[in-house]
């Protein structure tokens, strides 16, 4: 049934749902930053998604949703590797090196890489002049963020300390990995229920993250009792607000609003993350950050306005 044929929900419900995917998801980047100050990054990431995945999976089971088949579990593990191990793994790791607001801006390039995936992998998108300009704007934005200084001629230079190169590259790899997963999800067998599919993927991702964390030796010398209440609050926020409430609001909005309108979270989240990082985390907010962020967000706005398809992957767990 089309969105226009459905009974429109109460306006306040729509506003609350948008507030969740705009502001709750935007604040998750700062919560990650808080957590990885005390907990090893991949272990903290694993704790989040094991907990969230288990709760979502049990929720889907309680609703009598059909259990994933063996093939669907294999698909879930493949997507979970790309989304949770690579994308989120690099995000949590990078936030030890890169301000949370900058991390959010760099990850806002995901729509650009998704567009490239649709061109290269799916063949459902053409490289038009408008898309080319949008992609170049996104690249320029990241280049500005990573540069040491920018000579503006008579206007002077945009200087300041550059962001950590390894952290920035890790975030870009994560964005590319997410875009590949989004393209593959349209071809892989997955549970019909978005709730069950998301729960399975988060569980699979959390399990793999635990294994990678252990292999990297993150557990050695780490003691849960030494973790402060602030870090635990950050974890609870990520599980219940970021993953569960955010996912619920996102799926609900997809049933009541156009995908293009719902997709606007992609360029609101970075702004929220930068503001929160500046005011609560004391993160730098210079002219170069504003300029680079402007280019990235201009790219995101252009690309998301061109794409009106419902995502096949639960974009889900912010």
Predicted regions and their residues:
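C-terminal-most transmembrane helix of multi-pass membrane proteins
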Residues: 2-7, 49-50, 58-60, 148, ...
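Specific transmembrane alpha-helical segments of multi-pass solute transporters/efflux pumps
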Residues: 24, 28-29, 55-107, 143-144, ...
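Juxtamembrane C-cap of transmembrane helices in multi-pass membrane transport proteins
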Residues: 28-39, 51, 88-98, 106, ...
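Membrane-interface helix termini and inter-helical loops of multi-pass transporters
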Residues: 30-38, 93-96, 146-163, 216-230, ...
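Hydrophobic/aromatic residues within transmembrane alpha-helices
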Residues: 35, 44, 48, 94, ...
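Specific alpha-helical transmembrane segments that line the substrate/conduction pathway
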Residues: 43-54, 83, 88-130, 135, ...
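Hydrophobic transmembrane alpha-helices of multi-pass small-molecule transport proteins
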Residues: 56, 109, 117, 129-150, ...
């Amino acid at each position: 049934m089309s969105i226009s044929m459905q009974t429109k929900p109460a306006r306040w419900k729509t506003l609350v749902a948008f507030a969740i995917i705009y502001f709750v998801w935007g604040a998750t980047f700062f919560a990650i930053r808080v957590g990885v100050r005390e907990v090893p990054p991949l272990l903290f990431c694993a704790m989040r998604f094991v907990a969230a995945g288990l709760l979502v999976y049990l929720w889907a089971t309680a609703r009598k949703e059909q259990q994933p088949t063996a093939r669907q579990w294999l698909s879930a593990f493949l997507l979970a590797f790309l989304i949770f191990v690579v994308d989120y793994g690099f995000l949590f790791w990078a936030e030890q090196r890169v301000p949370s607001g900058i991390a959010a801006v760099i990850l806002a390039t995901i729509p650009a890489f998704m567009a490239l995936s649709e061109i290269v992998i799916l063949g459902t998108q053409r490289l038009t002049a408008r898309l080319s300009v949008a992609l170049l704007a996104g690249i320029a934005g990241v280049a500005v963020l990573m540069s040491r200084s920018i000579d503006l001629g008579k206007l002077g230079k945009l200087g300041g300390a550059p962001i950590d190169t390894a952290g920035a590259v890790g975030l870009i790899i994560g964005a590319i990995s997410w875009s590949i997963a989004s393209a593959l999800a349209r071809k892989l067998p997955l549970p019909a229920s978005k709730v069950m599919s998301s729960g399975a993927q988060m569980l699979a991702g959390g399990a793999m993250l635990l294994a990678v964390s252990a292999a990297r030796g993150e557990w050695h010398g780490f003691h849960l009792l030494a973790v402060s209440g602030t870090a635990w609050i950050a974890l609870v926020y990520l599980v219940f607000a970021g993953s569960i409430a955010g996912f619920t609001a996102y799926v609900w909005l997809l049933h009541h609003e156009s995908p293009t309108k719902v997709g606007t979270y992609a360029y609101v989240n970075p702004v929220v993350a930068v503001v929160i990082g500046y005011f609560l985390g004391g993160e730098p907010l210079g002219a170069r950050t504003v300029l680079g962020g402007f280019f990235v967000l201009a790219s995101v706005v252009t690309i998301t306005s061109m794409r009106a398809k419902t995502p096949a992957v639960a974009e889900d767990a912010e």
